[in-house]
Amino acid sequence: MEREIPPELGLHAGLHVNAAVEGMAEEEGLHLLAGAAFDHAAAADVARGEGGGAEPCGGGEVNMEQQVQEGHVLDSGEGPSCADDRDKQEKKESLKEAAVLSRLTVNLMSRPRLETVYWQELQDEFQRGDMHLQYKYSFEQLKTHWLEPWEDMECAIKAFAKLALRPDCSYRITKTVTITSCAYIIGNGAIVEVDTSDRVAFRCRMQGMGPGVVGLDGITFINVRFAGDKFKGIMFEANTCLVLHGVYFLNFSNICVESWNKVSARGCTFYGCWKGLVGRPKSKLSVKKCLFEKCVLALIVEGDAHIRHNAASENACFVLLKGMAILKHNMVCGVSDQTMRRFVTCADGNCHTLKTVHIVSHSRHCWPVCDHNMFMRCTIHLGLRRGMFRPSQCNFSHSNIMLEPEVFSRVCLNGVFDLSVELCKVIRYNDDTRHRCRQCECGSSHLELRPIVLNVTEELRSDHLTLSCLRTDYESSDEDDN
């Protein structure tokens, strides 16, 4: 039987009670909670010791050859069973991992903090008119509510605003969570599984007037891992300010984030998703230090976007640029599987094959700023835009650049690394091969235009016999002269 833990003053009620951490737990109480977390593992070890007498294969090996030489005949049920021992070893490791997560949870929940006020108290004070147009409290003073897996997340966000998930638990979203006020969700690495038939999992709506807290603005998710194997809808639908900090999106078959307002994604990971970040017209995307891997469309930009310091690998399309953007210090690797290239886009009225970096034609938009990027085994599509496309200090390693018919005179490649780049100009489209129907990024299927191209690499490549590489095009302000 498990021993009972006597209650102590100032100690959190336990891991299975819904209560906020208000007081500072004593060191003895922390040891008691950690000991309680190990009771289940210890009981399981004792039960295994009494039930089975066979030792693991790695620990107590039986010399079967010596027993056969001595005339001992082994029965069918005698001797070690490696398969059973492996199962026991896996169970033991899983129990150890659970114990580590339990200790981590205890440590996080019992750590002393300067939390003094609840969100509801701030709202009451705001209703009385005491907090209009002023910031009276800071983020660390707002009390944290530790969310239990059985609680309603939408109601908890309205009541507490600042939520923390337990790393030793997994959460399930079974209905749409509508957020209409400030929210700050701290994931602590917890896994949130989305299992609902609704169209949207998190609906982030416009926010009204409310109390001002320094460090709490808009809707923020930090260090949460979302799993969408069972979900077919949109993960985030936001028309308000949304910040995603260190969030993981794993195996989503639809859109991860769809925004009509400002969205900031920092240090996020998108793995095996259909569409990562989609910025609708008049939206503002800020994507930096994110990882995109094995996605079909990582980024779709219809408004403005700042895309910096990201890494992408094995994506059918890293960025589909319909609006305007700034691309700096990104590292993009193309796909090795040719089946990932069988998508088209109809963004400019013509069905072109979707490339790794696809810049759509637009009569009023300027070319994107493209500096200090690494493109490896990429295909790049350049549609017609205003001005000149002049990438600076970009490495086009084993990459292919496709130019639409009128783009040839608007591209300048002075100042790039062009040893293994190949440029092709579209002469016309072959009508005889329009029978191929491909899946489009808009959701339907279209007939693909197969272009007839002309290699213009040497016409656009810099004359290295005339232009020296020891010029300012390849230098940076932070480089030393010596």
From Swiss-Prot:
The keyword Signal does not apply. The modification Phosphoserine is found at residues 476-477. Its main location: host cell. Pfam families: Adeno_E1B_55K, Adeno_E1B_55K_N. Keywords: Early protein, Host cytoplasm, Host nucleus, Host-virus interaction, Modulation of host cell apoptosis by virus, Phosphoprotein. GO terms for molecular function: ubiquitin-like ligase-substrate adaptor activity. GO terms for biological process: symbiont-mediated perturbation of host apoptosis; symbiont-mediated perturbation of host ubiquitin-like protein modification. It is found in: Host nucleus; Host cytoplasm. One of its GO terms (cellular component) is host cell cytoplasm. InterPro entries: Adeno_E1B_55K_N, Adeno_E1B_55kDa, Pectin_lyase_fold/virulence. Transmembrane segments: none annotated. Residues 73-94 are annotated as: Disordered. Residues 83-94 have a biased composition (Basic and acidic residues). Contains a PML interaction motif that allows the subnuclear PML localization. Interacts with host PML-4 and PML-5; this interaction promotes efficient subnuclear targeting of E1B-55K to PML nuclear bodies. Interacts with E4-ORF3 protein. Interacts with E4-ORF6 protein. Plays a major role to prevent cellular inhibition of viral genome replication. Assembles an SCF-like E3 ubiquitin ligase complex based on the cellular proteins ELOB, ELOC, CUL5 and RBX1, in cooperation with viral E4orf6. This viral RING-type ligase ubiquitinates cellular substrates and targets them to proteasomal degradation: TP53/p53, LIG4, MRE11-RAD50-NBS1 (MRN) complex, ITGA3, DAXX and BLM. E1B-55K probably acts as the substrate-specific adapter of the SCF-like E3 ubiquitin ligase complex. Belongs to the adenoviridae E1B 55 kDa protein family. This is E1B 55 kDa protein. It comes from Human adenovirus A serotype 12. The lineage of its organism: Viruses, Varidnaviria, Bamfordvirae, Preplasmiviricota, Tectiliviricetes.
